[in-house]
Amino acid sequence: MENFRQLITASAENYGSRVAFTLKEGKGKYRDITYTRFLDEVRSLGQALIARGYGGQRIAIIGKNSYQWVLANAAIQVEGGVSVPLDKELRYDEFLECLVRSEVTAIFYDKKEKENVEKAMASGETKLKDAFPLYGVVGDGSQTTIFDLMGAGIAQLWNGARDIDELEIDAHRVSTLLFTSGTTSQSKIVMLTQHNIVANVDSVMRLNIIFPEDTNIALLPYHHTFGGTGQWVMLAAGARTVYCDGLKHLQSNFKEYGVSVFVGVPLIVETIYKRIRKSIDQKNMNLGVKAMRVFARGLGKARIDVRRRVFASIQDALGGHMRLVVLGAAAADPECIKAMNDFGVTCIQGYGLTETSPILSAERPDRLRSGSVGQPIPGVEMKIDEPDENGIGEILARGENIMIGYYGNQEATDDVLVDGWFHTGDLGWMDEDGYFYITGRKKNVIVLRNGKNVFPEELEQEVSQLPYVVENIVLGVPDGGNDRDPIVTLKLVYDEKAFLGKTRDEIYDLVKADVEKINDSTPPYKRIRKIIVTEEPMIKTSTGKVRRFMELQKIVEGEN
């Protein structure tokens, strides 16, 4: 496969009557979209966009994960346009800047974005000509919705129009513009082609981990390339996709839909694991569960898998069908991953970036290695550039999934694409079997005055093991304004329920005692020298990544 039209058509041919999406339309009311119907609706919407003059144009999409979001994105691709997915958490000024920088001429939007979209249309600063709601009913007359467009497209196809089928797709032309995380003015715009993303989908399909019998719950935002490409994988594999009613309803949704797989960030699994661990603690079952884990693991080595039966109660709490979780976008807690695997839910970690469409490496269900992000997926090469005495260096990659560059920023493109290799900006090492391990971002490394390097992610992993930790970050905070002599500083967000009746000073002393234990097993130069404790959540991106620079600014400015 080279393009999305081929992918969608092949899925309709292979899985025609199978359900591609199940949509909730009220309490106890559901509507199924088959693969055949999905293809028909993509063709109809794509035809309507061409008829309105948007063939090959840049069109933005903003809103929560939904079937209509997928439909709009697929139609834009199939009509040869350029999709510009935007983060629904953007402030108005950031949203406006994204519209201006990407030069989109139309936008699909969700109900919650209506005010910002109307304001942007009226500003005169963008090139927007049309705004199409992803909600509403056909023919209400006030606005042309996605449903109105589909209706028009159906009529055009019925009357013999075939623009959507006859259009030649250049798979190597820019088809998606994605903003990297960071402040909007500093973010780069990644240019991906249909070939880039389809090549990545094909590589993941060759891992043979998703099947037509699977039900996927779409958790990662579609504007994030991990979530977006993950959805294309589900469509290529013939799986069914459902949508979450909100994270507090996640486990009930698992049971409601019989969810068997999802793509997510470690925070989701770690939250689930903490609930399981809390239940085990309350029932005084620690020793019993530990023994059962050892027992099940031992039989597993003999290729006898009894995990789902031994831990049936945990499986039931996860809906009864959960078998696979694909994790990415952040480092995962090794103990959490090991425990979930023991409970019968295989958690595999992947690694990649927006610029790589995104997946570069992944564990395989039969090749798990604690702490690693697996081996390169088929079609991808990876290596360590200029490794130090510990084998740590920058991770480089090449393959058909690598972006063609940053939009409007040739200098930044030349910085990362050198001699056919993409410089990820991540530091890591590779073991003798080709498994990769991430030690941190180059830009996050704390360089001490003595020249020693502290990788904050390593310390954060240790701190995250403490039972009351909600989230934490380790930063190099300038000592009295001296950037060349940073203090290794921990900021920790704690669970208030864990310290009921304690004063702030008492909480600090308890945390400090635990951190000192971590320091005792850490080389002197790596030790945490300053601690900040708070119950206030940190500033994060919509995918749950802590905005390190903004947190550092708060500390330097004395806001903590």
Each language-model region and where it sits:
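Conserved pre-ATP/AMP-binding loop-to-beta segment of ANL
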Residues: G16-V19, P133, A155-F179, Q186, ...
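Conserved AMP-binding/adenylate-forming core of the ANL superfamily
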Residues: S17, F21-G53, Q57-S66, V70-A74, ...
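Conserved AMP-binding A3 loop
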Residues: D32-T36, S175-V201
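Structural core segment of the AMP-binding/adenylate-forming
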Residues: V78-A152, E496
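AMP-binding/adenylate-forming catalytic core of the ANL superfamily
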Residues: L90, I107, G399, I404-G405, ...
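Conserved AMP-binding/adenylation subdomain of ANL enzymes
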Residues: V198-T215, Y222-S313, H321
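Conserved AMP-binding/adenylate-forming
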Residues: F262, V306-F436, K442-V445, V470
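Conserved C-terminal "lid"/linker of ANL adenylate-forming enzymes
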Residues: I473-P478, E516-N560
